[in-house]
Amino acid sequence: MIQGTLYIVSAPSGAGKSSLIQALLKTQPLYDTQVSISHTTRAMRPGEAHGQHYFFVPVAEFEHMIAEDAFLEYARVFDNYYGTSREAIQQVLATGVDVFLDIDWQGAQQIRAKMPDARSIFVLPPSKEELDRRLRGRDQDSEEVIGRRMAQAVAEMTHFAEYDYLIVNDDFNTALLDLKTIIRAERLRLGRQKLHHDALISKLLAD
């Protein structure tokens, strides 16, 4: 079985990262590409399902998993834990399915240290002006909050050079095509192609 690839995708808020991933998943079959499902200790909300939106676990279980080094990365947000299970990711990758993980640069650093074969993608907005427009377009934040989110976005963008690939999301369809092209290129890497075409290669090179 050919191992799937873990893709780490990061971007400042407003760059369109989540929209790109969701659009990609709509065009890729589930047996081919999936999004990572995190563990969390927060309460399940109406309409959510265990194993579909999150793996909902008690605090004691989560903290036991931390002690067992079971997470590729984790963080505490307010009173709740969120984390990416190493075992859950590896089980999906072992079936040949590519997994996409939407995460910030700090989480990306943790994951690359534990899974150096992961591929990382950073998404940039086309300009600060466009990023500001997108943040304001949500019509839900005050000027103070928008200013703080912009400052956080700039801080996030300073880490773009730590990634393998860079996408500028100016035109959404072009950015989506860029994302698909990265996946296609990774699937054409020599190591993966040798496994996929092992029988053919053996016949071609046979005396």
Curated annotation (Swiss-Prot):
The keyword Kinase belongs to this UniProt entry's keyword annotation: yes
EC category name: transferase
A GO MF term: guanylate kinase activity
Name of one Pfam family that matches: Guanylate_kin
Chief location bin: cytoplasm
Binding sites annotated in the UniProt record for ATP: A11, P12, S13, G14, A15, G16, K17, S18
GO annotations of cellular component type: cytosol
Enzyme Commission no: 2.7.4.8
Domain of life, source organism: Bacteria
Domain Guanylate kinase-like per the UniProt entry, residue ranges: 4-184
Reactions that this protein is recorded to catalyse: GMP + ATP = GDP + ADP
InterPro entries associated with the record: GK/Ca_channel_bsu, Guanylate_kin-like_dom, Guanylate_kinase, Guanylate_kinase_CS, P-loop_NTPase
Cellular compartments annotated: Cytoplasm
Swiss-Prot/TrEMBL keywords: ATP-binding, Cytoplasm, Kinase, Nucleotide-binding, Transferase
PANTHER family: GUANYLATE KINASE (PTHR23117:SF13), GUANYLATE KINASE-RELATED (PTHR23117)
HAMAP family from the UniProt entry: Guanylate_kinase (MF_00328)
Reported function: Essential for recycling GMP and indirectly, cGMP.
Family listed: Belongs to the guanylate kinase family.
Name of this protein: Guanylate kinase
Species: Sodalis glossinidius (strain morsitans)
